[in-house]
Amino acid sequence: MEDLKSIIRNIPDFPKKGILFKDITTLLGDAKSFQRMVDLLSHRYVGQKIDKVVGVEARGFIIGAALAYKLGAGIVLVRKPGKLPSQTRSKTYDLEYGTDTLEIHTDAFNKGDRVLIADDLLATGGTMAAVVDLISSMDVELVECCFMAELEFLEGGKKLPEGKVFSLLKF
């Protein structure tokens, strides 16, 4: 895993001073590394029945679509308000300075679907907790929340269901 971690570029003071941003575009842009990352993540779920993979806007779309393809599952998009064309349900959640809202189509799942939620990075866990809450009343089974990378020191996993979090790379 160290080889994949080393490809992720560190950008100091982005998006604001004091933050060391993990730029995953360097890994995504390297074909062999991207393929290896998708293979490693998907391998965890081979043999489990995954009906839908939920991709969280925006980089979660990349990870989610690749995993859905590898697992033979459908892809469901969770987006910011006003981006989905049909009837939606929404979840507003707190940020450090304000709130944000996510939406999902009301007909995104079939009853009893086994769902994997995918995103690029687990930081504080606020966004993923909102996604878990959003789908929790949709009569589906959450298999796991999976991430390409996690910033462990932010302890975002504590906001998510116990035993339902997997991160390939940990910083």
From Swiss-Prot:
Q: InterPro entries given for it?
A: Ade_phspho_trans (IPR005764), PRibTrfase_dom (IPR000836), PRTase-like (IPR029057), UPRTase/APRTase (IPR050054)
Major location, coarse class? cytoplasm
Q: Localized where?
A: Cytoplasm
- One GO BP: AMP salvage
Q: Which pathway does this chain act in?
A: Purine metabolism; AMP biosynthesis via salvage pathway; AMP from adenine: step 1/1
* Top EC group: transferase
Catalytic reaction(s) noted? AMP + diphosphate = 5-phospho-alpha-D-ribose 1-diphosphate + adenine
An example Pfam family from this entry, by short name, is: Pribosyltran
Any GO MF annotation of the entry: AMP binding
Q: What's the EC number here?
A: 2.4.2.7
- Record keywords: Cytoplasm, Glycosyltransferase, Purine salvage, Transferase
Gene3D superfamilies the UniProt entry points to: 3.40.50.2020
User: Its domain of life?
Assistant: Bacteria
Task: Give the CC-aspect GO terms.
Answer: cytoplasm
Family per UniProt?
Belongs to the purine/pyrimidine phosphoribosyltransferase family.
Known partners and oligomeric status: Homodimer.
Q: What does this protein do?
A: Catalyzes a salvage reaction resulting in the formation of AMP, that is energically less costly than de novo synthesis.
Protein name as catalogued? Adenine phosphoribosyltransferase
* Species, as recorded: Geobacter sp. (strain M21)
Give the gene name.
apt
